[in-house]
């Protein structure tokens, strides 16, 4: 979630500085605020969920599927939100100056090295149904 938090901070800063339409900062516009609000909410939920599962693990109460659930959800939401926040930058999103494009690329890669979302879905499916869908 750290990459998403950085995307949120950079997007906020950019949106407050970038001026359009009668010299207003683009942060003034509803869709920019919605994108920031959605991303901030998902980051907060993800961090809180990770802390909770960490506490449960420390107490010996965490099930493996809890880890899969958090990894799957946090990686997916971080990528989705960073892509949405990237839209705020328009063409500047690919500039090295803002780093948001780098974060999106790195988050895309985490879909592979953190264990594909599909694999975590199968682990969760097994926990929910009691049936293993993979060999």
How does the language model describe each region?
Residues 1-135:
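Alpha-helical interface subdomain recognition
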């Amino acid at each position: 979630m750290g990459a998403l938090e950085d995307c949120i901070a950079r997007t906020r800063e950019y949106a407050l500085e970038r001026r359009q339409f009668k010299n207003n900062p683009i942060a003034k516009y509803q869709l920019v605020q919605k994108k920031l609000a959605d991303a901030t909410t998902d980051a907060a939920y993800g961090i809180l969920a990770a802390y909770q599962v960490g506490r449960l693990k420390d107490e010996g109460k965490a099930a493996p599927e809890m880890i899969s659930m958090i990894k799957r959800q946090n990686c997916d939401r971080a990528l989705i939100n960073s892509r949405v926040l990237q839209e705020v930058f328009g063409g500047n999103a690919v500039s090295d100056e803002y780093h948001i494009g780098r974060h999106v690329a790195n988050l895309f890669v985490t879909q592979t090295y953190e264990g594909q979302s599909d694999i975590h879905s199968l682990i969760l499916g097994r926990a929910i149904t009691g049936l293993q869908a993979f060999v």
